Amino acid sequence: MPSACSQFADLGQPILLLRYRSFFRQTGHAMNESITQIKDITAKPAPLGLLGFGMTTVLLNLHNAGFYELNSMVLAMGICYGGAAQIVAGIMEWRKGNTFATTAFVSYGLFWLSLVALIVLAKLDWGAASDEKAMAAYLAMWGLFTAVMFIGTLRLNRALQVVFGSLTILFFLLAIGDFTGASAGFKHATGYEGIFCGFSAIYAGLAQVLNEVFGKIVLPLGLVKK
């Protein structure tokens, strides 16, 4: 039976180490120990999570920028790709022992589901609609969370720094807009910032896909020297 389990990174691929112990009773106790290495060859879930976040963010912020009204397309993306896909990616990252990615993808997946719930619950009269100050507090809390997560990206790559940095700005701009009752022009400008944020996540996700497929850097991520 395995008595210990740990993961190590080997060229970006975790290796699962299972330690087996066998005991023999003679005049005393002797222990034989062997280690079996199992290389993790499962696919990288990060591109799925980044694309789910990025595409949904672009579509929502096209609404914020004034291109169309909020509609079922945005809500469906929030439930399925922005919500469910990110949660799946986060669970897969948990299996790989990636605390940062697990926290990010599961949290933002649940953010999208909670945002849809805020809209739908009010429409169904299952609760009072959130006023602007409540929404400002909601968005500011997510902005604070994202700002702290941004610090973590300083050890990762430039592409993720852009994603989390622009997302932090987006959350606080949205919070300010709701708290102050900002003009339509301010909210439209915030929408354009959100479109940029979404496309930066799409870039980061597709870069990982193409770089792996071609076995070389097709789209640079700007790796940080540790």
Question: Where is each model-derived feature located?
Answer:
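Structural signature of hydrophobic alpha-helical transmembrane segments
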Residues: 70-82, 129-141, 164, 191-195
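Alpha-helical membrane segments in multi-pass integral membrane proteins
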Residues: 137-148, 158-179, 186-207
